[in-house]
A protein has these predicted regions:
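Juxtadomain coupling helices with adjacent low-complexity linkers
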Residues: 67, 178-204
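Regulatory sensory and allosteric helical modules in signal-transduction proteins
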Residues: 94, 102-154
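Sensory-domain boundary capping and coupling elements
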Residues: 165-178
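Intrinsically disordered, low-complexity terminal regulatory regions
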Residues: 53-111, 198-203
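Short cysteine-rich clusters marking metal-coordination/redox-active sites
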Residues: 11-14, 33-36
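Cys/His-rich microdomains that often coordinate metals
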Residues: 18, 40
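A short, aliphatic-rich beta-strand micro-motif
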Residues: 158-165
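Short linker/helix segments within small regulatory modules
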Residues: 21-31
Length: 204
């Protein structure tokens, strides 16, 4: 095999020798040429699109299942437990999934799937408390950078918190954590907000 001269380098992906003029800062450190970098980026973009489509289809299948789980059920704790189990088992990016319920001036832990969690959260504290204060969904790509984040689990890296409303009043939250950064997007937001509306009668 030909050896690369001082003015050439070897791309680990395509196996071709490249001149120094082809280096980008990133490519130089990884020994990957610009052409291969571009192909990798295109493949990653395509993979993300496919993953988003699969996620949307999964949520689409889950909506009627959630409706079925709560229909005519008097055991509201059991119904919420089943909903959290259904969601948690349906997505690989769900590390923790459960509910926090408004009780006076705190949020109390409800049914969930995942590691042990905080029993109570005050308004304005952490992601859940901030979502309660703002009365809106919060999507946090990196919880380590979120001011006042409550680290119930050291594994959590990103989080989405969705309020459950009764009229204008927030009565509970769907809380989902992931071990990966930037795990949640607009699809998660839109679909979990739909689920929040479906389960709202359980809190009446």
């Amino acid at each position: 095999m030909k050896k690369a001269s001082k003015k050439e380098w070897y791309c680990k992906i395509c196996g071709r020798f490249r001149s120094n003029e082809k280096f980008s800062g990133k490519g130089h450190s990884l020994h990957v040429c610009k052409d291969c970098q571009r192909k990798i980026q295109e493949e990653q973009h395509t993979k993300k699109l496919v993953t988003k489509m699969e996620k949307a289809k999964t949520y689409e299948r889950l909506i009627p299942q959630v409706e079925s789980l709560i229909e005519g059920v008097d055991n509201h704790v059991g119904a919420l437990a089943n909903v959290s189990a259904l969601l948690h088992s349906s997505f690989q990016h769900y590390f923790w999934c459960g509910f926090y319920i408004v009780k006076g001036d705190v949020l109390e832990l409800g049914p969930f799937q995942g590691d042990v969690a905080c029993y109570t959260i005050k308004k304005g504290r952490g992601v859940c408390g901030k979502a309660w204060e703002d009365k809106q969904t919060l999507v946090v790509p990196n919880v380590l950078q979120f001011p006042g984040h409550i680290a119930c689990s050291s594994k959590s890296r990103s989080e989405i918190v969705v309020p459950v409303f009764k009229g204008e009043e927030v009565i509970a939250f769907i809380d989902v954590d992931s071990e990966g950064y930037s795990a949640f997007d607009d699809i998660d937001k839109d679909e979990l907000e739909k689920i929040a509306k479906i389960i709202s009668p359980l809190f009446e």
